[in-house]
UniProtKB/Swiss-Prot annotation:
HAMAP family: HisZ. It comes from Rhodospirillum rubrum (strain ATCC 11170 / ATH 1.1.1 / DSM 467 / LMG 4362 / NCIMB 8255 / S1). InterPro entries: aa-tRNA-synth_II, aa-tRNA-synth_II/BPL/LPL, HisRS-like_core, HisRS/HisZ, HisZ. Its main location: cytoplasm. Required for the first step of histidine biosynthesis. May allow the feedback regulation of ATP phosphoribosyltransferase activity by histidine. Pathway: Amino-acid biosynthesis; L-histidine biosynthesis; L-histidine from 5-phospho-alpha-D-ribose 1-diphosphate: step 1/9. Keywords: Amino-acid biosynthesis, Cytoplasm, Histidine biosynthesis. GO terms for cellular component: cytoplasm. This function is generally fulfilled by the C-terminal part of HisG, which is missing in some bacteria such as this one. One of its GO terms (molecular function) is histidine-tRNA ligase activity. Heteromultimer composed of HisG and HisZ subunits. It is found in: Cytoplasm. It holds the Pfam family tRNA-synt_His. This is ATP phosphoribosyltransferase regulatory subunit.
Length: 384
């Protein structure tokens, strides 16, 4: 088939959107299913949420952090504003606080689906992509977060990504330290940006008398084996010390349970973790663009109901970037009149059977349709 300029123009998609073609689409579906199957085998029950819902339900409480990434449309039936989900976590939290409010806690849920965002990023230009993840509702603290970390790492390994780096963070640590030092919210915000950028010289100059306490944090970023002793030795005030101790406990628990995993620590990281209220984490792998996913502890709140929650979300575009594509299943061209039992037997042996809708089912037609085999007179696949 010849593609004309007019056809090509009609196929042009907006920035950040793309078609996924064979065999990549099948590989993504299979990988998502492997991940969610591991989650389900560990007690996480599957849920499915709508792509679009009323704005007030989608952007409530901590989920307001995603408001800037949410497409909005007017519902022509109710005349109410609706939002296209930019993240599934907030929808699962809504389910837990409403339709599953009476379910016993801790409530373990798993999900997968497409999300759409207003803008991409430099590392992730895609605006539409698949998420898969877990949410642990009604449980917080180190043990719950460690469960999220370790199960996500295990699922990635079973899906084909055995070498993963876990970067452990604590978004509330720096704000707690700034409050203890008596810094204004505006100054604390500026310092947080500089510390995220690892511009410790500028942060010290801006902090004034508080420079010493903040500068000490510079040695707490990096491989856990080196950073943890430095972090443990810091003399921090009450609330900040509590966050630090939680991060230390989480790191030690993950390192003990999964010694094969590379663990790094960055208590200064905050960007993208705006609605997390405890320890958080990000996942990386060699060959993948940016983060594979992230997670942590956050408040599940809806209509005044607040309960501790934690979980993890994987970004499938990044996960697939880091994986080696498997060899495609062998394809065999078969006559459209082939007995159903014979076709099923071939498929059970791992063959993809492609029906020949014309009388010609020979080698030339097989090659044209991307089949490496045809059936011989005895019904056995032979290479062409």
């Amino acid at each position: 088939m010849t593609v004309t300029a007019k056809t090509a123009a009609r196929a042009l998609l907006p920035n950040g959107l793309r078609d996924v073609l064979p065999p990549d689409a099948a590989f993504e579906v299979a990988t998502v299913e492997r991940l969610v199957s591991v989650f389900a085998a560990n007690g996480y029950e599957r849920v499915k949420t709508p792509l679009i819902e009323f704005e007030e339900g989608l952007l409530t409480g901590a989920s307001r952090a995603t408001a800037g990434q949410t497409f909005r449309v007017m519902d022509p039936i109710t005349q109410r504003m609706m939002g296209l989900r930019a993240d599934i976590t907030i929808q699962v939290a809504r389910l837990a606080a409403s339709r599953l409010a009476k379910a016993p806690r801790p409530l373990r849920l798993t999900y997968s689906g497409q999300v759409l965002r207003v803008k991409g990023t430099q590392l992730r230009p895609e605006r539409q992509f698949t998420q898969a993840g877990i949410e642990l509702i009604g449980a917080g603290g180190v043990d719950a977060i460690a469960e999220s970390v370790l199960l996500t790492v295990e699922a990635l390994a079973q899906a084909g990504l055995p070498r993963v780096t876990v970067d452990l963070n604590c978004p509330p640590l720096v704000p707690a330290l700034c409050r203890a030092l008596g810094l204004s919210e505006d100054l604390a915000g500026e310092l947080r940006k500089l510390l995220e950028q690892k511009d410790f010289t500028a942060a010290a100059a801006l902090a004034g008398d508080a420079a010493g306490a903040l500068s000490a944090l510079s040695g707490t970023v990096g491989p856990a084996e080196r950073a943890l002793p430095v972090l443990a030795a810091l003399d921090l005030p009450g609330e900040a010390a509590g966050h630090r101790d939680a991060l230390l406990a989480l790191a030690r628990k993950v390192m003990t349970a999964a010694p094969e995993v590379d663990v790094t620590v960055d208590p200064l990281e905050h960007k993208g973790f705006e609605y997390y209220t405890g320890c958080s984490f990000a996942l990386f792998a060699q060959g993948a663009r940016g983060e594979l996913g992230r997670g942590g502890e956050y408040p599940g709140d809806l209509n005044g109901t607040v309960e501790p929650c934690c979980g993890a979300t994987l970004y499938m575009d990044a996960v697939l970037d880091g994986m080696v594509r498997p060899a495609p299943a062998p394809r065999v061209l078969v006559a459209s009149t082939l007995a159903r039992t014979t076709r099923r037997a071939l498929q059970a042996d791992g063959w993809v059977t492609v029906p020949a809708l014309t009388a010609e089912a020979g080698a030339a037609e097989a090659r044209r349709l991307g089949c490496g085999h045809v059936l011989d007179d005895e019904g056995r696949p032979v290479a062409v």
